[in-house]
């Protein structure tokens, strides 16, 4: 498709006339619709293959035109310089996504790459790093190259990288021994191993496992920020800032001069101690002697295209006023300096005076720029058919008769075949082989997608998309923006940090104080140091670390510490044990009951089912497909289904449920879709109607929005079997509703129903298939204990065209709020404004109304009557309001695809899981969502709040919540699954221990023998310094991770693997680590030989075998193998256990390793037959 439309256009006279002057002189091109314009621009780029700059008035327009251009130009050649709005960018902590796109763009330009660069106005005017300085900081490292390590590390800091002990996020680097790890903004994390100052090897590595993979010969390291800050820049900044401070001070009110002094001092302090790019970017106008703008990065022969010039001029005017107001507010309040700015004040067109510019506008209008040519195109919109086949047939026939070339773009290969056969049935000839020459009067159906179709009458060309045929939305063309791996979303909530609460299986809740190396006797070992009540401390040898878990409970709860040696912990554990046993009994009864009961067994999928599923306009995610298969498998079995489908907000649970409902209807069964609120009922009802409009399925709704007459008719229809699917609130559970043949009950968010309703659902479950949907994740640990009791399906992958919500953490400021509101409303979107104080919520609305006089603003809170609240929400969904000022009542369940900006005041007061769920309200369509978490300006955040906001910022990836925020939700989910009263028990022993106890109880009741996950304990006591010294591994977390791995080693292969990892991550290891590995090696062989104890007696080593191993060993073989040890080895038997003594010599450790290996090899292998 890329070449076909473009080729067709390139041969047209009108395009050739345009091509001659395009990029040579100032021209105006008018009359083209957005997708036709994208087509012409893309064709010009493909033909000339030079750098091309395309300026739009805002990021929304840039995104829109980019989507269409990507249909023609390969995504490796399309670049965007995404800037939201200048002030928010400079004053907030931002997600790395946009930053990496900006860095990619600047780097490509600085290296003279060809490409089509799309830039919104505020990105075009922004002050940037001088081009030469940027070029100096492009680094390519090659194997064999000699580097000055200090200068190299210094350069990384200039480029915006942060030094950490372990690299886990974009923009970090670490140095351990001779190993440098770097996670660049573009590309994969790399590990550089040095031999003195020479680059010995470069490998990419995985941040999740910290292991390196393939060797590479060279790596390009891009900057981690769009500003480069060197020592010279800091020097220049200090001088300029001092001048600005001295100039500003006398010009402002005396009352705020102290504030100005504080602002100045804080910046000065910041520069001298540790400069943070996020903070210093506010001072960009003082940083460089001659800052650049984006146009300075382009080559002289670049082609410049401006989209809708007059609209850009309007935006520029607003932008200039906004920045000036913003800065004067800062200056007047003592928070800013005269001369502090972010962009070039020269007008936009003045920046382009040196270049020939092609201006594209839809209508011809007067423009204040010199023009040499005006080229007018005639372009018509395409008829919207929306599935009306008669109109479609007559229009297509008209095109064919008039010798038009018609190109129909559809999104998948299967749809190509379906549309072709549909058109062939209308007797319209179609072609699918787009490589042959296309004649007029033909219809080509091919894969592709544009935002809309267009008709160019002069060229006799019509392009029609699915949107015109069937009203489906364009699928977003994904660009290769780097998605952040799960590892980065925050390693795991199990990471132990000093000060964390822990649970020791035998001693209870304590506090983790770190790893300490202690000298006991003459040997050094590592111990985990724990603090208990009062001054009690416990040192746990690292090889017993599996008895210590991180304490995880409901959000932000601090537990009481236990007393060492007290009875309190024993009592607590006994109570919890009783409770999990009761639950286990309940679960087992339920399990037996389900196995015994018989329900309806559905048949295999029908042809209608396949047609219905093909109709879905999006690709299913792998998790959705798996869930659908699991549900259909349940339905096709005789026992009733009871499955829980859990997936993050907006991950496509509804589509899975809709397919199950359709399957039930095709087998002549009725379906009840039960939801907690009237609004959700309305939304699900509309979804079902839209999805099933082409199939003979009768769908009805029972809710307060229906008249008594409609509800009466629905009830009759359910009783007679006329109604196939009914959607409704708890009214569906009423005694007055009778079904002719109910086959499937779908329950959305069961935990939100009352006790009475839950009981009614329980009775229905006995002989009807039940599918329950929930957005609260169910913890993995519970999946295991629930296996076979309640079936679970999990959707963890987001749909293809969902974008991460761009998350900003900002100080509260009216300018930011106004800007965010204006940006969303300018793209015809809506805003959730979260204000959690009911008593002053109406004042907040008035305040916002003064900021945005033209906006329609509504209020929603929990003290309104249910009817008022529902009507307000419905009006908001129907876009009667632009802004909804609301409390946390929106946390669950409402889907407003058009609301894509969320602003939360005092975000520092919210819990992590709450912020995560609230943020899931936006970014639900294919538009990018924005979330602004505001905290009061002069308030010092407490540590927890700061960590929380930091975490939110880091999980800007979709669904990344399955990590840290999910900790709290997991516990909530566990409570929902097991009953609210379990919350207290979970909190008393911590979530992990609770899950473990539950799993053991369930398995015991089901008669399943627990396979020990860890190796049986072999006591090895040797007088050796065997530990991980702090000089070798600085990070305590990394230390604990390695000790955990060593504890699980059961084979030589696994041991080699850990050795490789140590060398890979921390370089060659010292003697203490070698001794530690020797002990693990001895344990591995001892484990397979049935050895129970290896003990250092001073002059000899004692080895005791288990009675079973004593029976199994082949004594003759052992003596034969151990001959080299001579008299150093003695063997005896005591209490049915073999006792081997090894006299110590100089090389006693090697002798011991040899001996244990011999014992293992002497075990008699039983014949299999």
UniProtKB/Swiss-Prot annotation:
Any GO molecular function: DNA helicase activity
Binding site for ATP: 647-654
Key words of the record: ATP-binding, Cytoplasm, DNA damage, DNA repair, DNA-binding, Helicase, Hydrolase, Nucleotide-binding
Subcellular location: Cytoplasm
Domain Helicase C-terminal: 809-970
Pfam family of the protein (one): TRCF
UniProt-listed Enzyme Commission number(s): 3.6.4.-
UniProt GO cellular component terms: cytoplasm
Domain of life: Bacteria
Keyword set includes DNA damage: yes
Extent of motif DEEQ box: 748-751
Primary location class: cytoplasm
UniProt cross-references to InterPro entries, sorted A to Z: CarD-like/TRCF_RID, CarD-like/TRCF_RID_sf, DEAD/DEAH_box_helicase_dom, Helicase_ATP-bd, Helicase_C-like, Mfd, P-loop_NTPase, RecG/Mfd
Residue ranges occupied by any Helicase ATP-binding domain in the UniProt entry: 634-795
GO terms classed as biological process: regulation of DNA-templated transcription; transcription-coupled nucleotide-excision repair, DNA damage recognition
Entries under SMART domains matching the protein: CarD_TRCF, DEXDc, HELICc, TRCF
PANTHER family reported for this sequence: ATP-DEPENDENT DNA HELICASE HOMOLOG RECG, CHLOROPLASTIC
Function in brief: Couples transcription and DNA repair by recognizing RNA polymerase (RNAP) stalled at DNA lesions. Mediates ATP-dependent release of RNAP and its truncated transcript from the DNA, and recruitment of nucleotide excision repair machinery to the damaged site.
Family per record: In the N-terminal section; belongs to the UvrB family.
Protein name, entry field: Transcription-repair-coupling factor
Organism: Staphylococcus epidermidis (strain ATCC 35984 / DSM 28319 / BCRC 17069 / CCUG 31568 / BM 3577 / RP62A)
């Amino acid at each position: 498709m890329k070449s076909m439309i473009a080729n067709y256009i390139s041969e047209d006279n009108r395009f050739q006339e345009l091509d001659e002057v395009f990029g040579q002189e100032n021209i105006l091109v008018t009359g083209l619709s957005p997708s036709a314009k994208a087509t012409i621009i893309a064709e010009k780029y493909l033909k000339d293959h030079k750098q091309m700059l395309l300026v739009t008035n805002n990021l929304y327009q840039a995104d829109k035109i980019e989507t269409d251009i990507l249909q023609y130009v390969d995504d490796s050649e399309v670049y965007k310089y995404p800037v939201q709005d200048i002030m928010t960018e400079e004053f907030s902590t931002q997600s790395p996504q946009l930053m990496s796109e900006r860095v990619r763009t600047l780097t490509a330009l600085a290296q003279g790459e060809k490409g089509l660069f799309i830039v919104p106005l505020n990105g075009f005017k922004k002050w940037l790093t001088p081009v030469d300085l940027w070029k100096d900081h492009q680094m390519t490292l090659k194997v064999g190259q000699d580097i000055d390590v200090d200068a190299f590390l210094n350069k990384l800091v200039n480029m915006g990288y942060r030094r950490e002990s372990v690299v886990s996020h974009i923009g970090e680097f670490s140095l351990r021994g001779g190993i440098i790890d770097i996670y660049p903004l573009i590309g994969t994390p790399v590990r550089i191993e040095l031999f003195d100052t020479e680059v010995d090897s470069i490998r990419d590595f995985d941040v999740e496992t910290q292991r390196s993979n393939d060797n590479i010969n060279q790596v390009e390291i891009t900057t981690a920020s769009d500003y480069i800050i060197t020592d010279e820049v800091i020097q220049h900044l200090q001088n300029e800032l001092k001048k600005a401070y001295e100039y500003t001070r006398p010009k402002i009110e005396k009352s705020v001069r102290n504030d100005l002094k504080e602002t100045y001092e804080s910046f000065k302090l910041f520069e001298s101690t540790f400069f943070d790019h996020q903070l210093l970017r506010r001072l960009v106008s003082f940083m460089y002697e001659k800052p650049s703008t984006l146009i300075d990065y382009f080559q002289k022969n670049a082609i410049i295209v401006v989209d809708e010039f007059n609209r850009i001029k309007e935006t520029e005017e607003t932008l200039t006023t906004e920045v000036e107001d913003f800065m004067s507010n800062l200056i007047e309040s003592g928070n800013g300096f005269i001369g502090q700015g972010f962009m070039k004040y020269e007008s936009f067109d003045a920046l382009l005076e040196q270049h020939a510019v092609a201006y594209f506008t839809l209508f011809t209008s007067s423009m204040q720029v010199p023009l040499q040519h005006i080229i007018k195109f005639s372009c018509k919109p395409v008829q919207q058919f929306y599935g009306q086949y008669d109109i479609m047939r007559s229009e297509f026939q008209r095109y064919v008769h008039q010798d038009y070339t018609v190109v129909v773009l559809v999104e998948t290969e299967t749809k190509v075949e379906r549309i072709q056969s549909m058109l062939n049935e209308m007797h319209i000839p179609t072609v699918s082989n787009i490589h042959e020459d296309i004649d007029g009067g033909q219809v080509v159906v091919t894969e592709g997608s544009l935002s809309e179709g267009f008709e160019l009458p002069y060229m006799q060309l019509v392009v029609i998309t699915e949107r015109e045929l069937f009203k489906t939305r364009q699928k977003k063309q994904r660009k290769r923006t780097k998605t952040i791996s799960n590892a980065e979303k925050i390693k795991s909530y199990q990471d132990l940090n000093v000060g964390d609460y822990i649970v020791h299986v035998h001693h209870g809740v304590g506090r983790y104080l770190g790893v300490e190396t202690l000298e006991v006797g003459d040997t050094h070992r590592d111990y985990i140091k724990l603090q208990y009540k009062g001054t009690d401390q416990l040192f746990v040898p690292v090889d017993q670390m599996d008895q210590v878990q991180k304490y995880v409970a409901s959000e932000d709860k601090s537990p009481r510490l236990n007393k060492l040696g007290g009875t309190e912990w024993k009592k607590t554990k006994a109570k919890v044990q009783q409770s999990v046993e009761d639950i286990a009994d309940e679960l087992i009864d339920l399990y037996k009951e389900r196995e015994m009961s018989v329900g309806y067994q559905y048949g295999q999928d029908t042809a209608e089912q396949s047609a219905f599923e093909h109709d879905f306009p999006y690709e299913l995610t792998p998790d959705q497909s798996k869930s659908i298969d699991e549900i259909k498998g349940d339905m096709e079995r005789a026992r009733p289904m009871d499955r829980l489908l859990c997936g993050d907000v907006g991950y496509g649970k509804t589509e899975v449920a809709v397919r199950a409902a359709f399957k039930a209807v095709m087998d002549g069964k009725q379906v009840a879709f039960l939801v907690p609120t009237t609004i959700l009922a309305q939304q699900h009802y509309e979804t079902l109607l839209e999805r099933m409009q082409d199939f003979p399925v009768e769908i009805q709704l029972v809710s307060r929005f229906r008249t008594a007459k409609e509800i009466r008719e629905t009830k009759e229809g359910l009783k007679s079997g006329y109604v196939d699917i009914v959607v409704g609130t708890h009214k569906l559970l009423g005694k007055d509703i009778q079904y002719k043949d109910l086959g499937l009950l779908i329950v959305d968010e069961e935990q939100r129903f009352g006790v009475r309703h839950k009981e009614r659902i329980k009775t229905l479950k006995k002989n009807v298939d039940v599918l329950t949907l929930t957005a609260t994740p169910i913890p993995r640990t519970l999946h295991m204990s629930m296996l076979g009791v309640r079936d679970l399906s999990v959707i963890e992958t987001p749909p293809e065209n969902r974008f991460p919500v761009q998350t900003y953490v900002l100080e509260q400021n009216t300018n930011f709020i106004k800007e965010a509101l204006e940006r969303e409303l300018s793209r015809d979107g809506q805003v959730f404004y979260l204000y959690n104080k009911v008593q002053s919520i109406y004042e907040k609305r008035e305040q916002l109304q003064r900021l945005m006089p033209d906006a329609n603003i509504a209020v929603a809170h929990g003290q309104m009557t249910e009817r008022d609240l529902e009507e307000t929400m419905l009006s908001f969904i129907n876009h009667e309001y632009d802004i909804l000022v609301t409390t946390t009542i929106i946390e669950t369940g409402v889907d407003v695809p058009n609301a894509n900006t969320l602003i939360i005041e005092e975000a520092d007061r919210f819990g992590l899981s709450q912020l995560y769920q609230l943020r899931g309200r936006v970014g639900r369509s294919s538009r990018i969502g924005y979330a602004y978490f505001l905290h009061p300006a002069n308030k010092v955040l407490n540590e927890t709040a700061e960590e929380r906001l930091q975490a939110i910022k880091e999980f800007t990836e979709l669904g990344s919540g399955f990590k840290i925020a999910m900790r709290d939700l997991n516990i909530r989910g566990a409570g929902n699954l097991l009953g609210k009263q379990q919350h207290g028990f979970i909190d008393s022993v911590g979530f992990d221990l609770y899950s473990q106890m539950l799993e053991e109880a369930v398995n015991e009741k089901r008669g399943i023998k627990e396979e020990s996950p860890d190796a049986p304990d072999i006591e090895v006591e040797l007088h050796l310094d065997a530990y991980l010294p702090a000089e070798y591994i600085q990070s305590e977390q990394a230390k604990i991770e390695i000790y955990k791995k060593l504890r699980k080693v059961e084979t030589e292969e696994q041991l080699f693997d850990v050795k490789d990892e140590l060398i890979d991550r921390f370089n060659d290891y010292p003697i203490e680590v070698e001794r530690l590995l020797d002990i693990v090696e001895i344990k591995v062989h001892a484990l397979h030989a049935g050895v129970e104890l290896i003990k250092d007696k001073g002059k000899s080593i004692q080895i005791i075998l288990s009675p079973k191993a004593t029976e199994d060993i082949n004594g003759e073989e052992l003596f034969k193998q151990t001959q080299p040890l001579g008299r150093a080895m003695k063997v005896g038997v005591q209490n049915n256990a073999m006792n081997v003594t090894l006299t110590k010599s100089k090389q006693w450790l090697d002798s011991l390793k040899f001996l244990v290996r011999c014992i293992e090899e002497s075990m008699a292998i039983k014949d299999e037959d």
